[in-house]
UniProtKB/Swiss-Prot annotation:
GO terms for molecular function: chitin binding; endochitinase activity. It is an enzyme of class 3 (hydrolase). This is Chitinase 7. Hydrolyzes chitin and may play a role in defense against fungal pathogens containing chitin. Keywords: Carbohydrate metabolism, Chitin degradation, Chitin-binding, Disulfide bond, Glycosidase, Hydrolase, Plant defense, Polysaccharide degradation, Signal. InterPro entries: Chitin-bd_1 (IPR001002), Chitin-binding_1_CS (IPR018371), Endochitinase-like_sf (IPR036861), Glyco_hydro_19 (IPR016283), Glyco_hydro_19_cat (IPR000726), Lysozyme-like_dom_sf (IPR023346). The keyword Repeat does not apply. Residues 1-32 form the signal peptide. Belongs to the glycosyl hydrolase 19 family. Chitinase class I subfamily. It catalyses: Random endo-hydrolysis of N-acetyl-beta-D-glucosaminide (1->4)-beta-linkages in chitin and chitodextrins. Disulfide bonds join C35-C50, C44-C56, C49-C63, C67-C71, C118-C173, C185-C193, C293-C323. Its EC number is 3.2.1.14. The gene is Cht7.
Amino acid sequence: MIAARAANLQVAMKALALAVLALAYAAATARAEQCGRQAGGARCPNRLCCSRWGWCGLTDDYCKGGCQSQCRVSRDGGDDDVAAVLLTAPGGGRAGVASVVTSDQFERMLPHRDDAACPARGFYAYRAFVAAAGAFPAFAATGDADTRKREVAAFLAQTSHATSGGPYSWGYCYKEVKGATSDFCVPNARWPCAPGKAYHARGPMQIAYNYNYGAAGEAIGADLLGNPELVATDPTVAFKTALWLWMTARSPSQPSPHAVVTGQWTPTPADSAAGRAPGYGLTTNILTGGLQCAGGNGGADRVAFYKRYCDVLGVGYGPNLDCFGQAPFDGGIMSASAAK
């Protein structure tokens, strides 16, 4: 089963790489430094460490070696340390994504990610997910409690499908494509490839191509053009790239998945005519460029992951779960045969 899923994953990565092409336009909106003297003395949300360079995170790069504030936790701490220090809200309860999904629920959703058959075993830790989410304060913190749960379920479902070793408890089995036949380097003046580096699919959302690595790296404060391997060696960085893809709008006319699942996007008449409606299904349209929508299976596997995770979190599914019949935002079907 793992071998078959690996073959399917290679096909899916090609589709995903095409789907995120428009992210080059999002690079211009990359954020400035987040904390410390570079940001007027601001502190990081959710008690993340502020690095010497003014970025928020939980690894030793942030919490040691010139850390400016809230330097008490590093990635060496366990989940209990994260819960006790990083995630404590002013009232004493949990803050951020940890208030939506607990470590126990995370384990129930992804029980086989550390299986001996999974190349990513030991990589995708709950504490890394929580630390990365802290750099995106709106994630799992927009809307009412049910909306927040559905966003976490949707994000974990889409990333589980992208890294799956089988349905529907085998999410996060892979952290990068093995045996890539391309370095995924294309000419780009702003995000030129570093010599000898490969930008194949890595991380929970399987980010690919130099322009996406460059834009994501600038947004999260990491040199991913020079060190793309970080996405497969640092779990916090890996989750941050996935969250950047989730939170970033592709173009003025195409929303981010975050905006869709939190009810911040309203379809235009053109969207309605194209069959695009609010709901989990539209996130599949966005993330695959419509490959699984018009002529595909509507993202049935992705829906199954999503339903399972909503059940774990105890929340309803919401409307429009699949994307069958939706046109992609660019107005054309790229290759329905590439969908899986």
